[in-house]
Amino acid sequence: MADSNLNVPVIIQATRLDTSVLPRNIFSQSYLLYVIAQGTDVGNVANKANEAGQGAYDAQVRNDEQDVILADHEQRISAAEATLVNHEERIRQAESTLQDHETRIAQNESDISSLDTRVQSLESQVSDHETRIDALEYATTRKKSEVVYSGVSVTIPTAPTNLVSLLKTLTPSSGTLAPFFDTVNNKMVVFNENKTLFFKLSIVGTWPSGTANRSMQLTFSGSVPDTLVSSRNSATTTDNILLATFFSVDKDGFLATNGSTLTIQSNGASFTATTIKIIAEQ
């Protein structure tokens, strides 16, 4: 704390010292001048002392102010150090948490990599299953040609006649000859698969009266031709003829690669058909 006494000036009691206040004819002129100079020197010393005291007081006041500032700085530094310690502790905790996170992330990345491998394997299996399912769906999907011709009058002669050539000139009541009956090459074709083909031909019509021995014959061309024959009694007025069979189709086999020509002929007399239904199914 500043000493207030330093702020009190030195007071000189003898404020005037000159030749008028000294005894005359006692001291020499040199001594009188010396005494007068001493008074001046004392005044100068007092002034300097007052200036020094004032400076010392001002310095102590400034020191007191700086002490307050330093105390505030020390307090703030202490608070900052405490905050820094807290920050260091939190940083250590954060680093520990980060290390834990890095460990868990590394584990997760390893798990994800394993899962990616398993997902890729599953995707490959799914793709394989989809391919197999598509194949199974295709294999179990029925392909069929079913055509009905009704209200017609078609003569089936006694000479061998290509059945597809005969049918393609007619207008069907329902259905189409495709895909099993090729109207360009006039033959029956099959899908190149190891699947059985079922065939049925139903014809309604009549032979001329008086025809004794009569039958309908259908031949399928092939390495070993198959022939179907339906015989009818002469007493029957309206004849319902049914010719049905099946073919065990082999992939890349003769029937799959060549198809089969269907040749029909009426034995005994020409046959007039009024309704025809032909079905092929694989």
From Swiss-Prot:
Main location: virion
Compartmental location: Virion
Binding site for L-glutamate: E146, K200, S248, D250, L255, K277
Keyword Repressor: no
Region C-terminal globular knob, residue ranges: 132-282
UniProt keyword annotations, A-Z: Coiled coil, Late protein, Pore-mediated penetration of viral genome into host cell, Repeat, Viral genome ejection through host cell envelope, Viral penetration into host cytoplasm, Viral short tail ejection system, Viral tail protein, Virion, Virus entry into host cell
Region ranges (Interaction with tail hub protein): 2-60
Residues in Trimerization heptad repeat repeats: 61-67, 70-76, 77-83, 84-90, 91-97, 98-104, 105-111, 112-118, 119-125, 126-132, 133-139
Top-level taxon of the source organism: Viruses
Transmembrane segments: none
Coiled coil: 61-139
Known role: Cell-perforating component and plug protein of the phage tail machine. Together with the internal ejection proteins is required for stabilization of the condensed DNA within the capsid by plugging the hole through which the DNA enters. Host cell membrane perforation allows viral DNA ejection. The needle penetrates the host outer membrane. The needle is released and the internal head protein gp7 is ejected to form an extra-cellular channel.
Comment field (misc): The tail needle knob is bound to L-Glu, which might play a role in the assembly of the phage tail needle knob in vivo.
Assembly notes: Homotrimer. The trimer forms an elongated coiled-coil (280A x 25A). he N-terminal tip may exist in a pre-ejection extended conformation, which may fold into a trimer of hairpins only after ejection into the host. Interacts with the tail hub. Interacts with the head-to-tail adapter protein.
Family, per entry: Belongs to the Lederbergvirus tail needle protein family.
Domain notes: the N-terminus forms the domain that binds to the tail hub protein and plugs the portal vertex channel, the middle coiled-coil rod, and a C-terminal globular knob.
Protein name: Tail needle protein
Organism: Shigella phage Sf6
Phylogenetic lineage: Viruses, Duplodnaviria, Heunggongvirae, Uroviricota, Caudoviricetes
